[in-house]
Design a protein with these regions (language model features):
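Terminal helix-turn-helix DNA-binding modules in bacterial transcription factors
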Residues: 39-78, 100-118
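Short intrinsically disordered, low-complexity coil segments enriched in acidic
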Residues: 1-7, 97-98, 103-104
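Basic/polar phosphate-binding segments, predominantly the helix-turn-helix DNA-binding elements
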Residues: 16, 20-52, 72-97
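A short, Lys/Arg-enriched amphipathic alpha-helix from helix-turn-helix/homeodomain DNA-binding modules
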Residues: 1-17, 23-28, 48-66
Length: 118
């Protein structure tokens, strides 16, 4: 069940399907899916879905030049403000702040690597 749920999430996390639909597709009730997620992931099924969205948002912010609006659209959010609130609620940083920190940490890493060469 958990492998099927993981495959469903991976292929459809950007569609924002209701948890009930994931449960139906895996052949269990929402309650049972939540119990399994708590057992295997130590969090609810909804949190597993949200963590996947956040992971992809972080990847896009760090490794692409997509605007925050483009990332929101790519991840299935119809409103960039809602995406920003969602991201901040899960990371404690706005998407812009996260991108800035990640860009600065890359610069620091590159500088440190250059210093090691000399």
């Amino acid at each position: 069940v958990m492998r099927l749920f993981a495959r469903q999430i991976e292929s459809q996390y950007r569609e924002h399907l209701p948890l009930k639909e994931y449960a139906r597709r895996t052949g269990v009730s929402v309650t049972h899916l939540n119990q399994l997620c708590r057992e295997f992931h130590n969090c609810s099924a909804l949190m597993v879905l949200h963590e996947r969205l956040i992971l992809e948002a972080k990847r896009c912010l760090q490794y692409t030049q997509m605007t925050i609006s483009q990332i929101a659209d790519y991840l299935g959010f119809s409103d960039v403000a809602y995406f920003s609130r969602f991201f901040k609620r899960h990371t404690l940083l706005s998407p812009k702040a996260y991108r800035g920190i990640m860009n600065n940490s890359d610069d620091i890493s590159e500088t440190n690597n250059l210093i090691k060469l000399f």
